[in-house]
Amino acid sequence: PEIFLTPGTGTEPDVSGDIVAEYIEMKQTYVNQSIGDAITGKTIRRAIYGNGVMYILAVDASKNPTLLAVDPTTHTVIAELPTNFCVVNSPEGYKLSDIALTSDGVLIGCSMDTVRNVSYYGSSDPWNLYKWTRDGNTWIGSKWFSRASNETAGNYYDAMVGSTIAYSGSFNSGTILTTAY
């Protein structure tokens, strides 16, 4: 996919050294339960609708994510999507902070993590993007993109990146916007 981190430049970022996607199949735990049973004790961070499915991202008190595909008519859980590949390094971050849909229906999400100015600090934790695809009744999740750079951090020396995301376009050709503060 084409990802442009610097608006208006039209140049593709250097992705050498980025993490290759690791595919993990889901394990079903909340399937056929009501939404209320599945999110009891959790805080909803985002709920979106697309592809005839409602997607709910909720986190528990330890910020561990639960990502559900829900039937919008019956309000029952169709699937719990895998999140065990989602990672975060900073204690104030989230393994999975937000989700969005591409115009061609691919579910994507991001971590919220501290990204530092590499030239100043010498190294940085990456900001991660994830994707989920559906093959029949099986959901497959993977790390899609991982990046640690000054541009990713909004040119701050030390920034929390990924509280929210917005995506415009298809999965293979789109624009990602995120927060850095």
Model-derived regions, located:
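Beta-strand-rich domains and repeat architectures in extracellular enzymes and scaffolds
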Residues: 30-63
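C-terminal edge beta-strand
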Residues: 2-9
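Repeated scaffold domains used in trafficking and secretory/extracellular systems
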Residues: 40-46, 87-102, 147-168
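Beta-propeller fold detector
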Residues: 13-34, 77-87, 138-151
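Beta-propeller domains
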Residues: 21-23, 55-84
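Entry beta-strands of beta-propeller and related beta-repeat scaffolds
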Residues: 52-56, 105-109, 171-177
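Beta-propeller blade signature
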Residues: 67-72, 122-136
